[in-house]
Regions:
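A short beta-strand-to-loop transition that corresponds to the Sensor-1 phosphate-sensing loop
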Residues: 1, 50-51, 101-103
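Interdomain hinge/linker at the junction between the two RecA-like core domains of SF2 helicases
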Residues: 1-37
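Generic structural signal for residues in well-ordered beta-strands
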Residues: 21-23, 66, 145
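C-terminal helicase lobe and adjacent C-terminal extensions/tails of nucleic-acid helicase motors
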Residues: 32-40, 47, 52, 56-62, ...
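Generic beta-sheet signal
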Residues: 42-46, 66-67, 95-98
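Conserved two-lobed SF2 helicase motor
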Residues: 91-104
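Phosphate-handling catalytic cores of nucleic-acid transaction enzymes
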Residues: 107
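Short Gly/Thr/Asp-enriched flexible loops that form oxyanion-binding sites at enzyme active sites
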Residues: 111
Length: 179
């Protein structure tokens, strides 16, 4: 008979902070549908798997309060854009939509009401969700992470296994206890 020591007492209380968003699987959607959804958002981050897709989305959405980040940009330029985004987001009355590649998933302190994440590995989806209701101030019902794939867009080489695992999990969200 073995004895176990609970390393994380009050586990439900400890992890309550991580249950600050609702995940929604949008499935396969059209590129134009994604654009229309993003146009209705007040504060949203959309992370796609390729620089080309990020650029195309940005060009379709471009306007006041729409920003684009990718690894194609020089670090100094990205830093300047991040500063502009933070400045804009400091005024709650202004909208802000950021189109990016996975570079914003870690090490970027931004907080959005909605995050759209193109299907990728589960770790990437979780990292993206970390940009939604980051402070835990908003109600969970107002903090959504939308997972989608774009109709006709090929999976990035090297990501097909991770993406297929995520797609399998998304078929039954109850398996991963995230809402």
């Amino acid at each position: 008979h073995r004895r176990y020591i609970e390393l994380c007492p009050n586990i439900n209380e400890q992890f309550k902070f991580f249950k600050r968003v609702i995940y929604e699987n949008l499935g396969i959607i059209e590129f134009d549908t994604l654009i229309e959804r993003l146009k209705t958002e007040k504060r949203a981050l959309c992370i796609v798997n390729t620089k080309k897709c990020a650029q195309q989305l940005y060009e379709q959405l471009s306007g006041d309060g729409v920003y684009h980040l990718s690894t194609s940009m020089y670090p100094k330029h990205r830093k300047k854009i991040l500063a502009q985004i933070k400045e804009r987001m400091s005024d709650k009355s202004k909208s802000c939509v950021l189109i990016s590649t996975s570079l914003v998933e870690a090490g970027v302190d931004l907080d959005f009401n909605s995050v759209y994440r193109q299907v990728a590995g589960v770790d990437s989806v979780i990292q993206a969700a970390g940009r939604c209701n980051r402070e835990g101030i908003e109600k969970k019902e107002n903090s959504k992470v939308y997972i989608f794939d774009i109709n006709g867009m090929k999976t990035v080489p090297g990501q097909s296994l991770q993406s297929s695992i995520t797609k399998g999990l998304l078929q039954d969200l109850s398996l991963i206890h995230i809402s």
